[in-house]
């Protein structure tokens, strides 16, 4: 697992009148700017993409995001892993139900029936809270992110958000809580766009097979805290 992927909103107080319709959504009372981020269990932010208008949903933001640019360019490092005796080429992200059924996304079951599916749902939802915790820590630690933004341009808001994210990671590293305290730079590779790489990314068959293998693997482990009580079934 590479981390948990999700989006959050920052209220834009000084949004120009002519842009308010573009940056507002029905479930938000004020104009907002979105942030897409990937966080791990130590709350380290591995990926951040800030700037999309608040009227968009997570899928629209994903289509603009550079999250999979390295994979499509053929410059991403290999990270194969094996689960349930099946070999997979790339790592995966934990997401909620709105994201597409790509090979690199693992989503929970909306209505699990099998006991193993119920255990998987519990574990998935518990692990995916990493990114929600990261957003909560960011907004509580940096008050400027929790209050309506007074900047007049998205460019300045983006700079503020990225600055807070960098400081957030620096604090985690300085406290010694980072899973990977040393960053090893990948060797430079000439970008080569590969159509097959994108096809592999969005492959639904791999998505469902990986999900099934993870359910079977989790079900084979002795994890009493994930057992479903008879009252909850």
Predicted regions and their residues:
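Short, well-ordered secondary-structure "scaffold" segments embedded in the functional core
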Residues: 1-233
